[in-house]
């Protein structure tokens, strides 16, 4: 799949697995189902100082649009509805309980890798 956040100039492929190596070259599927399916697709990416990958996520606001394309080329629009910061061991944001909705969660490090910035969005 692919993630596009026009407001931030973010446009990257989503790799299927999360490892130290894949996170160095792309954003990755951390947890959940396939792109644009019912459930909560969790995508992780590094927060590099040069704004690469998810380095600009702090600039996103509720109501902003994220686009996710699946492997069949279908693109869905998602509206950001929540952003918050958690400790690295808090994985509650990866819950698959979405009441039948299609959601995406973006995860990146913040505060010098001491915490995680979480961004939640739902299909519109």
Predicted regions and their residues:
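Solvent-exposed, non-transmembrane regions of membrane-associated and secreted proteins
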Residues: 1-124
């Amino acid at each position: 799949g692919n993630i596009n956040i026009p407001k931030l100039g973010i446009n990257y492929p989503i790799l299927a697995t999360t490892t130290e190596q894949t996170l160095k070259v792309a954003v990755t599927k951390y947890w959940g189902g396939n792109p644009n399916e019912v459930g909560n697709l969790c995508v992780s990416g590094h927060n590099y100082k040069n704004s690469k990958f998810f380095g600009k996520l702090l600039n996103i606001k509720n109501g902003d649009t994220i686009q996710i394309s699946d492997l069949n080329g279908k693109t869905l629009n998602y509206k950001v509805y929540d952003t918050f910061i958690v400790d690295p061991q808090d994985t509650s944001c990866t819950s698959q309980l979405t009441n039948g909705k299609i959601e995406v969660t973006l995860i990146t490090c913040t505060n010098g890798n001491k915490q995680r910035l979480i961004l939640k969005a739902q299909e519109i």
